């Protein structure tokens, strides 16, 4: 049976990946940048020391905090985001980095990962009260993930995302906590030049037989840290259609905090 718009709104209010499956409860209605360091003249020919990965605790300190982005609220996102990569699986290994990026998980090979959620703050705006449930959910929420890598791991993570966009152009199946959904199309997008490297892509997701919705993801590398951004508009998601782009203000503020 197809769920009503109200039920789907209930679901979208608590998801952070390209799937309804994380919300079954509602279904019934720093390290230093060594690449820039200079070797002494006596060791000019020696290879630069490999970059060290930041710890999860260090990454958590680099996440955006309340008050650092005007017009936005910051929350932990712990109640909506999957706790580990084992919770998010695809039917094509090449597509795993894309699914992880949309879930604020590390797209590459590392255990150092931290995440939160940054949403529009409309409470201070002098506007009329929402007229219906959909209007109340008409906010953009961006799930932000930070991951850190040793050596050239960050570059490899970015390549995995870029390669995945091409390999998964025809879509892929996604499963979370035993529930499945379908990404029907993936396409590269022109992302703003941020950090040292940026990969952006759009994903069309089947809305349980009620059309598709298009989501946008941006992945930015700065040094050996990778930041992922995935934006959901709850009202738009309930209707099907296209989500807004990842807010530039959120990307700019987060990348500025990275070492």
Task: Write out the residue ranges for each language-model feature.
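Soluble non-cytosolic domains of exported or imported proteins
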Residues: 53, 155, 241-245
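A short, solvent-exposed beta-edge/loop patch
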Residues: 185-248
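Bacterial N-terminal signal peptides that target proteins for export
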Residues: 2-13
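A small/polar (G/S/T-enriched), proline-flanked helix-loop surface module common
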Residues: 74-213
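Post-signal peptide N-terminal segment of mature Sec-exported envelope proteins
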Residues: 36-61
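Short, low-complexity, Pro/Ser/Thr/Gly-rich segments in the mature regions of secreted, periplasmic
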Residues: 248-258
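C-terminal motif of bacterial Sec signal peptides marking the signal peptidase cleavage site
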Residues: 21-25
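Bacterial signal peptide processing site
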Residues: 27-30
